[in-house]
């Protein structure tokens, strides 16, 4: 009987090992192919590219599995990859076309057909380059774009170094919502050459990538194009605040107030920088309100002045451009005394002059009376002698 029990235990052990081994063997045999026809497509949107692919071969064998794709992409020479996991057969994103683009993708299987484990295919890779034309020096220089008051976009640039006199540049732009890239139709010119662009009203262009390409033409050389990506809300330059007021509440507290800049920017989107001067001391502070209370360092200070400038804050953009400074608003201490002194000085001068003239006239009048008196006295004396 002991031998029979031993044989049964051995049989159970053998069956378990066989089942476990078959499971390992089945998992080891599960393989999936990478996606087919992986490519990077440029639709002509100045940097907004399509990454697209087709399902892998022999996918019918894995109907009980979830099929996903892990996509990695970046500009060449970038330090890190962007990673996306999707069930779709395409993905879209923006790239800097001044550099090349590289991407890779593989298939991921999850579910019953893999006994709960994850199976990955090998990588499929793709790259994209715009064929470089012209020397690097022919590209425009010092590209600068400002979205004035969240209403008017203006871009300006300088010509490339060493370009021939017949070289001229053209600007194209695109953002999501436009059917195709558009060329600037209002160039800023200098010596009949394009050095900037004033854009028309840009409908629904906020909080989107705004793509710009500035290329050039010349009969004597190729011109290297330049590509840029902006977020317009991050390059807004507001108007400066106006209607500043400075009120001294008491010997210590000062109230500074100004109006919200005019235009479409909501009041909640502003941050203000205040430059405050008390006699010869100047300091700077910021606030998100259009009013601030500060304390005088000395109750005997004679002059208080301040200026304000505005910028879009972090609640409405990632960055921004400070406005110009407002006009200065000042308060001067003991102004009534100064006013009194200034008003009394001319009066005192005139009064003194009148007094001097009166004294002079009085003096002359006295002398005249004396002369008349002495003359009459002498005449009277002579009459008595002859009488």
Model-found features: residue ranges?
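Extracellular fibronectin type III
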Residues: 22-30, 109-136, 218-238, 313-341
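Extracellular juxtamembrane "stalk/ectodomain stem" immediately N-terminal to a transmembrane helix
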Residues: 228-229, 233, 246, 251-253, ...
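Cytosolic C-terminal tails of single-pass type I membrane
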Residues: 355-387
């Amino acid at each position: 009987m002991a031998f029979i029990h031993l044989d049964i235990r051995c049989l159970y052990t053998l069956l378990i090992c066989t089942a476990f081994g078959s499971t390992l063997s089945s998992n080891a045999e599960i393989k999936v192919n990478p996606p087919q026809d992986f490519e990077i497509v440029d639709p002509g949107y100045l940097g907004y590219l399509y990454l697209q692919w087709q399902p892998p071969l022999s996918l019918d064998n894995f109907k009980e599995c979830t099929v996903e794709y892990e996509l990695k992409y970046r500009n060449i020479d970038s330090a890190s990859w962007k990673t996306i996991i999707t069930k779709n057969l395409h993905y879209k994103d923006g790239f800097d076309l001044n550099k090349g683009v590289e991407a890779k993708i593989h298939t991921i299987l999850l579910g019953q057909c893999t006994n709960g484990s994850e199976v990955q295919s090998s990588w499929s890779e793709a790259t994209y380059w715009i064929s470089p034309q012209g020397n690097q020096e022919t590209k425009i220089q010092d590209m600068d774009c400002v979205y004035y008051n969240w209403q008017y976009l203006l871009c300006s640039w300088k010509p490339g170094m060493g370009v021939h006199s017949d070289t001229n540049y053209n600007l194209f732009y695109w953002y999501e919502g436009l059917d195709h890239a558009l060329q600037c139709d209002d160039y800023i010119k200098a010596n009949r050459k394009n050095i900037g662009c004033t854009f028309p009203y840009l409908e629904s262009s906020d909080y989107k990538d705004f793509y710009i390409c500035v290329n050039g033409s010349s009969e004597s050389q190729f011109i290297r194009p330049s590509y840029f990506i902006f977020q317009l809300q991050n390059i807004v330059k507001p108007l400066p605040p106006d209607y500043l007021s400075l009120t001294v509440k008491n010997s210590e507290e000062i109230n500074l107030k100004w109006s919200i800049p005019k235009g479409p920017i909501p009041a909640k989107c502003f941050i203000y920088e205040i430059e405050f001067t008390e006699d010869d001391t100047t300091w700077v502070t910021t606030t998100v309100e259009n009013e601030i209370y500060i304390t005088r360092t000395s109750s005997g200070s004679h002059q208080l002045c301040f200026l304000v400038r505005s910028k879009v804050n972090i609640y409405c953009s990632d960055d921004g451009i400070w406005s110009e400074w407002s006009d200065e608003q000042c308060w001067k201490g003991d102004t009534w005394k100064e006013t009194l002194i200034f008003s009394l000085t001319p009066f005192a001068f005139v009064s003194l002059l009148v007094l001097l003239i009166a004294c002079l006239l009085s003096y002359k009048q006295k002398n005249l009376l004396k002369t008349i008196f002495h003359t009459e006295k002498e005449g009277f004396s002579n009459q008595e002698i002859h009488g």
